[in-house]
Amino acid sequence: SGSCTTKTCWTTLPKFRELGYILKDKYNEAVQVEPVRASRNKRPTFLKIKKPLSYRKPMDTDLVYIEKSPNYCEEDPVTGSVGTQGRMCNKTAQQSNGCDLMCCGRGYNTHQYSRVWQCNCKF
């Protein structure tokens, strides 16, 4: 007559919002690099930091990038982005259609609209 104790361990991911904050911080700290070839016909053998402000080799968990991301706030015929200028936005929304986010900090004009329609109401 003995007793048996079982322990089970597992790894879980952090909450999705926490993960988003971590990725956003890593994105903001990302460093631009350029591939360097040892010879003309070989694949790149290492990445060089493009604008070294202070020398710190990126760690395996850091984000690096080769090309800058396009600015979707401005019109860019090369990428096909029409920009956000002149688009309607929702002043009170916190999502992607909200004015603060969509207008990229440029400010926005507000307009008040009135709409009249037939409601077929009976009193």
From Swiss-Prot:
<keyword id="KW-0449">Lipoprotein</keyword>
<dbReference type="GO" id="GO:0048513">
    <property type="term" value="P:animal organ development"/>
</dbReference>
<feature type="glycosylation site" description="N-linked (GlcNAc...) asparagine">
    <location>
        <position position="90"/>
    </location>
</feature>
<dbReference type="GO" id="GO:0030182">
    <property type="term" value="P:neuron differentiation"/>
</dbReference>
<comment type="function">
    <text>Ligand for members of the frizzled family of seven transmembrane receptors that functions in the canonical Wnt/beta-catenin signaling pathway. Plays an important role in embryonic development, including dorsal versus ventral patterning during limb development, skeleton development and urogenital tract development. Required for central nervous system (CNS) angiogenesis and blood-brain barrier regulation.</text>
</comment>
<dbReference type="GO" id="GO:0045165">
    <property type="term" value="P:cell fate commitment"/>
</dbReference>
<feature type="disulfide bond">
    <location>
        <begin position="89"/>
        <end position="104"/>
    </location>
</feature>
<comment type="subunit">
    <text>Forms a soluble 1:1 complex with AFM; this prevents oligomerization and is required for prolonged biological activity. The complex with AFM may represent the physiological form in body fluids. Interacts with FZD5. Interacts with PORCN.</text>
</comment>
<keyword id="KW-0272">Extracellular matrix</keyword>
<keyword id="KW-0325">Glycoprotein</keyword>
<keyword id="KW-0964">Secreted</keyword>
<dbReference type="GO" id="GO:0046330">
    <property type="term" value="P:positive regulation of JNK cascade"/>
</dbReference>
<comment type="similarity">
    <text>Belongs to the Wnt family.</text>
</comment>
<feature type="lipid moiety-binding region" description="O-palmitoleoyl serine; by PORCN">
    <location>
        <position position="1"/>
    </location>
</feature>
<dbReference type="GO" id="GO:0005109">
    <property type="term" value="F:frizzled binding"/>
</dbReference>
<keyword id="KW-0217">Developmental protein</keyword>
<protein>
    <recommendedName>
        <fullName>Protein Wnt-7a</fullName>
    </recommendedName>
</protein>
<dbReference type="GO" id="GO:0060070">
    <property type="term" value="P:canonical Wnt signaling pathway"/>
</dbReference>
<keyword id="KW-0879">Wnt signaling pathway</keyword>
<dbReference type="InterPro" id="IPR013300">
    <property type="entry name" value="Wnt7"/>
</dbReference>
<dbReference type="InterPro" id="IPR043158">
    <property type="entry name" value="Wnt_C"/>
</dbReference>
<dbReference type="GO" id="GO:0005615">
    <property type="term" value="C:extracellular space"/>
</dbReference>
<dbReference type="Pfam" id="PF00110">
    <property type="entry name" value="wnt"/>
</dbReference>
<dbReference type="GO" id="GO:0005125">
    <property type="term" value="F:cytokine activity"/>
</dbReference>
<keyword id="KW-1015">Disulfide bond</keyword>
<dbReference type="InterPro" id="IPR005817">
    <property type="entry name" value="Wnt"/>
</dbReference>
<feature type="region of interest" description="Disordered linker">
    <location>
        <begin position="33"/>
        <end position="61"/>
    </location>
</feature>
